[in-house]
Amino acid sequence: MHSEEKYLHIPNNTKYPEIIVEEEEEDPSEEERSELSETDDVATPLRPSDTFPFKRRNSPCSIKMSEEHLKRLREIACPSPTPTQCSTVSKHEFQNWRINEDVMKDMMHIGTICERENVCKTSKYVYTATMASYTVTEWKLKEGNTPDEIEKISRTIEDLCQLRHKRLAPMYGYHWRLETELMVFRAHVPSGTVADLVKVSAIPQETAVRYIVHVIDALAYLHERKHVHGKLNASNLLLTISNDILLADPFIEGLPSAQKRRALLASPPEAFRSLESYPCLTPSSDIWSVGCVLVTMLTRYPPFLEHYMHFHGESLHRELVSEWCTRRQLIYSSQTLIPSASKEICELIDQIFNVDPENRPSAQNLLESHGSKSRKASLRNSLASLTTAKEPDPPKPIDDFYVEREDDEEHRKIEELRELAERGNNEGGFIPFIRWYMSRILIFSVLLVKWIGMVLCAALSLAAVAGGVFFAIFLIYNGIQIACQCSLNEGFVVLIALILLPIIILLTTLCCNNSLDRYHADVESGKVEKSRFVMKTPEKDVIVGGYILVEGSPDHDKPAEVPRKLGISEGLQSTMGNTFLGYGVDKIA
């Protein structure tokens, strides 16, 4: 008995249903189990097809399909060569790689991620029809591109849009806004890049090896399909939520270089045989860039960055050509670049940094030799951390929160300065009395000068206005004298003096009052006592001739804010993992 099938014509704008292909279960081999255990981060889209098989409702479900039908369903469900079998249509996919104006009307600009002036701008967009997020790179091309050059760029992007791999950030399409403005859409990954991690600190060796294996896996897929990335650096390695790597932003011929300095420092020796040899777009050049990225992860800087620190642009290009053509002073090896690295990393670095591109290993060879090692090392480290894990220590008394910091050099210096200040404050006699009063007079004088300056500026503004008024009065008086041929008996100078004298008195009073109010406010808040120009109030009274000139401040009157702030701010990082932190903070507060 054979099941009947009918092939219907489906329009291009039809959303395809999910296809589930049932096959006979077979015992997979060990290699297939490892491949199936790795999940794909990117859904593989269905290719628009002219025909699509549907079963009749009355066909029995228990009858198995023939091999021919299964083969046809596989071709429809998985048109692109991907490592996983996923047949659902992603909401990020468009009808065509070249996005039209109707789709762009529904695109909402969320924000700018980064921008390089006159080169490109990277932004986040949301397609309101599906609420899918995209990272869009807006390129600014030079004027005068021919239609053939524009078509070549479009074909290159369309070829890249067809690539789907679990370690590649998928590209979904492009849009020509103008002949000099191109928008390229790819997957949006909000977790950041490896470059963001490197800006903070170096990446641990185990994590760096894991990231590099992911990069090599993506390169092996690209090189197998005759594609070269050409722009491999830490800023193009996207981090997923599961802490995996997605390789993004491959080189597209015809687009400008946004980061020429990074590209030059990550280029292989064969790119500098002459000034015209750059850029070198070969699979072996990608492998050399992998080594540069690995060194960047472990040291935070590209190889020999200190040697090229003062070179930029064309001068850096000429310096690299001179280095690889004549001098050959820099040795790219694990001993010179990362001498403290593990044996596995040293072997990987020495294999990658082979000056001869013919003897440089391919991405597939590196994946076969180091991919399994990376997984075994990760599993071994996880088991070791579980076996060596210790139970947390019981909570300690809060007094140990400060005792354990005695070995800290910075803490010792602070304590010495505090003891020195306390010894100076406890000295009695006439000199501490003079220092105590003179320091406060100094603070008051500074505040007074500050307010005088502020009021002086206001007075200058007022003087400009008053000068204009007086000048107008002067012109009026002269006009009256000329018109009437008479002299006025009013004292013009006396009139001006009567106006200016109250203004000067009021401004002086204002300066003194504001300075005193500010001084008392600073004394009450403790700001004066914290100033390094002010002598601290002594613990004992300052007595001269039997008279108490300065009243002392006992220990119990001192505010407890200073030691509390020191204890929390300096010891927070060292005590973050301890279980008694919450109890200690409550007790201090």
Curated annotation (Swiss-Prot):
Primary localization class, coarse: membrane
A GO cellular component annotation in the UniProt record: membrane
Listed InterPro entries: Kinase-like_dom_sf, Prot_kinase_dom, Ser_Thr_kinase
GO molecular function terms attached to this record: ATP binding; protein kinase activity
Signal peptide: none
S-S pairs: none
Region of interest: Disordered: 1-51
Membrane-crossing segments per the record: 429-449, 456-476, 491-511
Subcellular location field: Membrane
Traits of the deletion mutant: RNAi-mediated knockdown causes an increase in lifespan of about 60 percent compared to wild type but only when done at an early larval stage. Lifespan increase is associated with a decrease in the accumulation of the age pigment lipofuscin, a delayed age-onset nuclear membrane disintegration in muscles and loss of mobility. In addition, causes an increase in lipid catabolism resulting in fewer fat droplets in intestinal cells and hypodermis and lower triglycerides levels.
Domain Protein kinase: start-end pairs: 97-373
Keywords from the UniProt entry: Membrane, Transmembrane, Transmembrane helix
Comment on protein domains: The protein kinase domain is predicted to be catalytically inactive.
Record PANTHER family: MITOGEN-ACTIVATED KINASE KINASE KINASE, SERINE_THREONINE-PROTEIN KINASE NEK6
The protein's role, per its UniProt record: Negatively regulates lifespan and health span probably by participating in nutrient sensing.
UniProt name for this protein: Protein drl-1
Organism: Caenorhabditis elegans
